[in-house]
Every structure is written in C-alpha cells, then in structure tokens.
Design a protein with these regions (language model features):
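Extended boundary segments
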Residues: 423-462
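Cytosolic Rossmann-like ligand/nucleotide-binding regulatory domains
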Residues: 451-508, 512
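Short, solvent-exposed coil/turn segments
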Residues: 95, 441-443, 483
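A structural signal for short secondary-structure junctions
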Residues: 366, 377-378, 440-442, 466-467, ...
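Alpha-helical transmembrane segments and immediately membrane-proximal extracytoplasmic
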Residues: 1-433, 451-452, 477-479, 493-496, ...
Length: 512
C-alpha cells in the first residue's frame, strides 16, 4: 500500500483550501444530481404502490398478489444487504465511522446497492426516510471523487464530509442544515476547512436540487404565527415530554435491532418481515406508510382526535422499530420528525382543550416538537433548530425552537440516553471488529480547533500528554501562522495542524 512522505503532505497542504473548494464544488454537483434522480424515481414509483394498496383495500382478490410482491421485494433487498452489508440502516453511522478512520467501504458498491435498496424500501412504503441514505450516498461520491483525484487521506476525509453535507442538503432542500450536520454530528470539528468545503458542496447540491423541485420548502409552514410569549410556559412541558419520547425512540430502535440480531433467521427473511408488515399497515392505516411527509402535512390540514393521534403514535413507533431494526437500507430522519410532530399535535390538543390555549397554535407545537425530537434523539440541537427552520421556510420560531430543543436535549441527557448514531456506530464497529483491520504506518495531517473547554487551553505543548507518534506542525492564531515549540502556549481559538498515524487518530481526538 502506498505511503505518503511527510514532505509531500506538507507541500500539498499549502494549497489545500483552494483545492478543496474546487473539489467540493464537483462533489456537490454530483451529489445533487444523484439525489435528485433518487427523489424523482421515488416520486414516480411511490404513487403506483399507493394505488395498488388502495385497490387492495377495495378488492381483496389482489391482496395475496400484493403480499407476494412485497415478499419478493424484501428478498431482493436481503440479497443486496448480504452482498454489501455496509448499506444496512441509514448509513450515517457508517459515514461517521469512516471519518474516524476506523471503517472502510467500497464506495462504488455501497453507492449502487444503497441507491437500489433504498429505492425499493422507500417506494414500497416502509417506515424509513431517504435522508440517511442520501447522506451515505453523498459520502460515497465524495470518497469516489477523492480517490479518482488521488488525494491524500486527510483531503479524502474533507470530501467525504462535503459529500455527506451535500446529501442532506439535496434531500431536505436545506443547505445550512447540511453544513451544520457535517460540523456538529458527522465530523465533530468546526475547523475552517470543514466549514468551507461542506458549505460549498451543500450549497451547490441545493442549487441543483432546486432546479428540479423549485424553491418551496420541504414542509410548507411559512404562514404560521409565532407562539405568544405568555404561552411560553408550555414549551417547558413540551420539551420534557418530547425528550422522554426521544429516549423511548432510541431504546426501541436499539432493542429491536438486538432482537433481529439474536434471531437465527437469514438476512433475506429478516428483510421480508418489514415488507410484510408494510402490507398490513397499507391495508389498515395507509397514512402511516413511508417516511411520513404526507402525514405531517395532514396534521396541518386535518383535526385528528386524541384517540386517533395516540393510535398513530403507537403504530408509527412500532412500525419504525421493525423496519429499521431489521437492517433494511433506510434512514430515521423523517420517521423521527413525524413521531415528534404526532406527539406535538397531541400535546397541543391537550393544551387547547384543558388550558385555554388558542387552537390556532396547535401547528406551533407540531413544528417545535419536531426540533425537540431531533435534538433528543440525535443530540445535535443546533442542527435541529436550523433544519426545522429551513424545512418550514420560516425563521419566526427560532426562540421557541431553541427552548424546546435544549430542554428535550437535557431531558434525554438526564435519562442517560446516548446519541442514536453513536450507539449504532458502536454496534457496527463491534460487529466487524474494525480495530483489528487498521492500516499501519499511514500518516494523517489534521486541523483541530481548540474550544473553550478543551484540556489544552492555557497549557504549553510540552505539558500536554499527547498520544505516541503525534507532532504539532503549526498553529493558526487569527491571521498568523506560528511554528510551535515545547514552550508555545495554546489558547482558545487556536487551530492546530497535527501530524499523526492513522491508527491513533481517534485516540488523539479523545485525548484533547
């Protein structure tokens, strides 16, 4: 395997920012086109399935053929999953694993199988979202561009992050959310290089997406009046309940996944199960099919009773648990937002019934609950606030969104619920014993931002306990680049350029 010399890495790093800008633009355009194609095919095939299900509810003769078709599709997805296990689930944990250098994938194989497998699951109506697969496909394209351009490993990491950001941006028509997700959740690093590359890719992918789908936000709630300040006491209760709901979601996903893992059923049978359940749901509660975009819009237009909402919540929870727990390729972004919206609608209805809140503000509780649910489950409150603002096309709810997001986030912390994607990543690493497959001797050149609460702040380089084979090459302080020595003191806001071995990358991040 090729090993890059230190001199070559340092030489290439001089023009890294400009090279990344161009490469990220390429990645963003390619990701945008790929996700647009994915969305268009889904929009064409999904109505066909819905029409077939509708006919099945009125003509029981075709019901057996519906289930035979779903079983066949489940078998095909199972074969795809057996051929390429990395397409399992949303794909976001896999991307995070790649960014920590613990996980490897065949980018082209994952891209192809994820595209096909995700299409089948989404068109058939399984309770999964397209956003996670979009992130993974974007990351695959980022890695593919990097490998074809023969970039160094640290450059590849930036382009993978850019691709993931672009994938979310194109899926939701939410470019800022794509950038923030890359910074807050995927890369967990707010360095200028990550920000620049992710923003260029995200904006370019969003531009491509809007050429096909227009400027209308994903959830059109632009004419909703903000909740009056006198009613803000309700946000505390909403945040706590949504936080608890998020904990239930996390535990349910992990528990169901464990049950499927312990079963001795073949991968094909495991994938067939959620397809059969989908057939049952299609005949009884068709509104619960798919990720849930139509259900959220139905909450805006229709007045459901408490009993109906409670039934929807229980059914959607169980439906999502089974679909995602089975391992079929599909995300949890939209299902978790739908569940948040349902719980928010229920709470809003109770507030209007028993506490005199005007019923015109029920829609506010729906919007706020989606952000709170995301913050509680994913533990990315800033992304949650920006995402819901972009999806609804309104910035009028920022204060209320912030309150609900932080309260739900704290509630899940108190209940000791871990971020869902980190929990899923731990299981993936354990399953594949990734730590035994690391490449030795490969060098990485990293840029690390020094935060206010970092253990390095106020210390000299010589006083910090660095991992073995780790060298601080330079420090960017404002507009000045310093060549450090052992007596150089690190302050908040510094950006450290560190050279290290690939196998201790995660150890380095954990130690600082």
């Amino acid at each position: 395997m090729k090993k890059y010399k230190v001199f070559e890495m340092l030489k290439r790093s001089q023009n890294l920012k400009y090279r990344l800008a161009i490469n990220s633009l390429i990645v963003g355009i390619l990701v945008g086109l790929t996700i647009v194609a994915h969305r268009i095919i889904i929009s064409k095939l999904s109505p066909i399935f819905l029409n077939i299900y509708k006919n099945g509810r009125h003509n029981f003769i075709i019901v057996p053929f519906i289930f035979l078709t779903l079983i066949a599709l489940g078998y095909i997805v199972g074969k795809c999953l057996k051929k390429q296990p990395m397409i399992s689930g949303s794909g976001i944990p896999q991307v995070e694993g790649i960014l920590t250098r613990n996980l490897k994938m065949n980018w082209f194989s994952v891209l192809m199988y994820k595209f096909v497998g995700g299409l089948i699951c989404l068109c058939a109506g399984l309770s999964v979202g397209r956003e996670g697969p979009s992130v993974q496909m974007g990351a695959c394209i980022g890695e593919g561009v990097s490998k074809n351009l023969k970039n160094l490993d640290n450059e590849e990491k930036y382009l993978i992050t850019s691709g993931a950001s672009a994938g979310l941006s194109a899926a939701f028509n939410a470019p800022l959310s794509g950038v923030m997700f890359a910074l807050e959740e995927a890369h967990k690093n707010f360095s200028p290089l990550v920000l620049t590359s992710a923003m260029i890719a995200s904006i370019s992918a969003d531009f491509v997406s809007k050429q096909f789908f227009g400027l209308i936000p994903s959830l059109d709630f632009r004419k909703v009046e903000p909740l009056p300040l006198k009613n803000y006491w309700t946000l505390i209760i909403l945040g706590i309940i949504i936080g608890i709901s998020g904990v239930i979601f996390n535990k349910g996903i992990l528990k169901t996944q464990s049950l499927f893992k312990k079963s001795k059923l073949s991968i094909e049978i495991k994938c067939i199960i959620p397809f059969v359940i989908t057939g049952v749901v299609a005949l009884i509660y068709p509104i619960l099919l798919g990720g849930g975009h139509d259900l959220i819009m139905a909450l805006k237009e229709q007045n459901f009773t408490v009993t109906v909402l409670f039934t929807f919540i229980i059914a959607k929870f169980l439906f999502t648990f089974i679909c995602f727990g089975s391992g079929v390729p599909g995300g949890i972004f939209f299902p978790l937002l739908v569940l948040g919206a349902l719980v928010g609608n229920l709470i809003g209805l109770l507030f209007t019934t028993y506490f005199g809140i005007d019923n015109t503000y029920i829609i506010n509780f729906i919007i706020l609950a989606m952000a709170g649910h995301f913050a509680s489950i994913v533990k990315a409150p800033i992304t949650a606030i920006i995402l819901i603002s972009e999806m609804t096309g309104s910035l009028n709810h920022l204060l209320a969104l912030g309150i609900v997001a932080i309260i739900s986030h704290l509630t899940s912390d108190i209940l000791k619920s871990s971020p869902i994607y980190e929990s899923l990543l731990e299981r993936i690493l354990e399953r594949y014993a990734i730590k035994d497959n690391l490449t030795e001797g490969k060098k990485l050149l990293l840029e690390i931002a020094v935060s206010m609460d970092s253990v390095m702040v106020g210390k000299c380089i010589k006083d910090i306990k660095w991992p073995k084979n780790c060298l601080v090459v330079s420090i960017l302080r404002g507009d000045n680049e310093l060549i450090p020595n052992g007596d150089t003191e690190i302050i908040c806001g510094d950006y450290l350029t560190i050279m290290t071995d690939e196998e201790i990358y995660q150890e380095l991040l954990d130690s600082i």
